[in-house]
Amino acid sequence: GGEKRRAAIAGVIAMNPEVLVLDEPTAGLDPMGRDVLLSQIVQYHKERKNTVILVSHSMEDIARVADKIIVMNKSNLVMFDKTKEVFSKGRELEKIGLRVPQITKIMLELREKGFDVPEGILTVDEAMNCISSLLDKEGKIW
């Protein structure tokens, strides 16, 4: 899915804009289409070093690709920081109607229950590494 959208984005990229602004580029795409498109956006940024501004309500997408995040609420700038820093403020984000990535929320809840997990876990791989370090050889949490 998303061939027309990818073709449209490719047409814009061919013009080599200094700043590429994408508004909800993954909306309505199936998971595979979303993964392909996000990978292409990341690759474009790495190769050309151009600025990419991604507007999205999908915090999972933002967590996967963004270096920095601007959070707006009612036309006001609420936060501007590195991705891990913004998502470590999950409760503040929830107050303005934004959700952190699901895995970040789970890790935040573990932290609030007293488990020694760091803030800013954004991916399943990071969470697995963190949780496995909490387990003993028998698979029990200390």
Placement of each model-derived feature along the sequence:
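A short, proline-enriched helix->beta-strand linker immediately N-terminal to the Walker B motif
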Residues: A14-E18
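Catalytic Walker B motif of ABC-type/P-loop ATPase nucleotide-binding domains
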Residues: L20-D23
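Helix N-cap at the start of a conserved alpha-helix in ABC-type nucleotide-binding domains
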Residues: P31-G33
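Helical segment within the ABC ATPase nucleotide-binding domain
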Residues: D35-E47
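H-loop/switch region of ABC-family ATPase nucleotide-binding domains
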Residues: S56-H57
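A short, surface-exposed alpha-helical micro-motif characterized by mixed small hydrophobic
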Residues: I62-R64
